[in-house]
């Protein structure tokens, strides 16, 4: 696989107080990312056999295949992202910890520690907190009390606009606290009511039906999208790539921007890929049957962007 990467180092944006600016974007050039290898999350086949039903996977993942797929996934990331940080194995967390996006959300000032709406994932927040401290990534806030939210329900439309999905994984108390914690960082805080869809046990996030690929390009599954939100995107001048129903179910709507109009997705979503290419995007694919489709977590779920510039 050939990558148009010249090996140059990308420079972080500095603020006047000489602090790093962290990620408040879904599409700018990805410079630093946190991931978790399936060797650390899935552990081994025996562990998967015991756990996959409890965590509501579609089927039992094949451990060796998962490791192989992840190698391909990481090789694409490595050609664009100068710094990839790996979460360590932990006996405190489960196999869903492969999806490093959900326990935390980065803002321009640092990290917000979340508490998953999926009870089995709530221990991930504490493990993540320790890791961020070790890496000296500032933590600017943490959900408390009854608040629950997943990172997959929080998207940056631009540096100053945040949209949060209100569904089974993110509740009103979390939205209240997130508003307070981001008050000095955003100009617009948009609450998007999510549909019941397949029910409480299924994982429907705001990011299930929208992926930003550039400031004016998004991959969407409009059938699940509230009318006001779809209209808002169009009014903001964002071109919508419409994912067909069959490809929605194979994670065609889950697209990770490595840079504006440079992205990666699970292979096999040909219609969506073609539309992206027609919009001028470079698309990389990885075989994600074990690490993505079976756990319904695409490339945006597998990654937690720390710095984008």
Residue ranges of model-derived segments:
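The feature marks the mature, well-folded catalytic cores of soluble enzymes
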Residues: 3-309
């Amino acid at each position: 696989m050939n990558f148009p990467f010249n090996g140059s180092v990308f420079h972080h944006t500095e603020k006047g107080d000489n602090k790093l600016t962290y990620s408040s974007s879904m599409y700018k050039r990805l410079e630093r990312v946190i991931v978790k290898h399936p060797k650390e999350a899935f552990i081994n086949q025996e562990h998967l056999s015991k756990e996959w039903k409890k965590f509501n996977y579609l089927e039992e993942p094949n451990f060796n295949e998962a490791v192989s797929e992840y190698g391909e996934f990481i090789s694409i990331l490595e050609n664009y992202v100068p710094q990839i940080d790996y979460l360590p194995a932990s006996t405190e967390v489960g196999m869903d910890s492969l999806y490093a996006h959900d326990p935390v959300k980065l803002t321009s000032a640092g990290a917000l520690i979340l508490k998953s709406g999926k009870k089995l994932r709530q221990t991930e927040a504490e493990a993540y907190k320790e890791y961020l401290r070790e890496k000296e990534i500032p933590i600017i806030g943490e959900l408390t009390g009854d608040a629950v939210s997943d990172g997959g329900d929080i998207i940056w439309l631009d540096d100053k606009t945040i949209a949060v999905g209100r569904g089974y994984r993110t509740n009103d108390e979390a939205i209240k606290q997130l508003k307070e914690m981001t008050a000095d960082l955003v100009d617009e805080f948009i609450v998007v009511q999510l549909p019941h869809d397949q029910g409480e046990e299924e994982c429907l996030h705001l990011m299930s039906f929208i992926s930003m690929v550039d400031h004016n390009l998004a991959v969407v599954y409009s059938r699940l999208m509230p009318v006001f939100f779809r209209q808002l995107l169009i009014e903001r001048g964002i071109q919508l790539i419409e994912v067909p129903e069959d490809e929605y179910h194979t994670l065609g709507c889950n697209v990770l921007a490595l840079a504006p109009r440079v992205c990666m997705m699970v292979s096999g979503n040909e219609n969506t890929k073609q539309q992206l290419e027609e919009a001028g995007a470079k698309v990389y694919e990885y075989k994600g049957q074990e690490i993505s489709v079976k756990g319904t977590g695409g490339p945006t779920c597998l990654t937690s962007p720390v710095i984008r510039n």
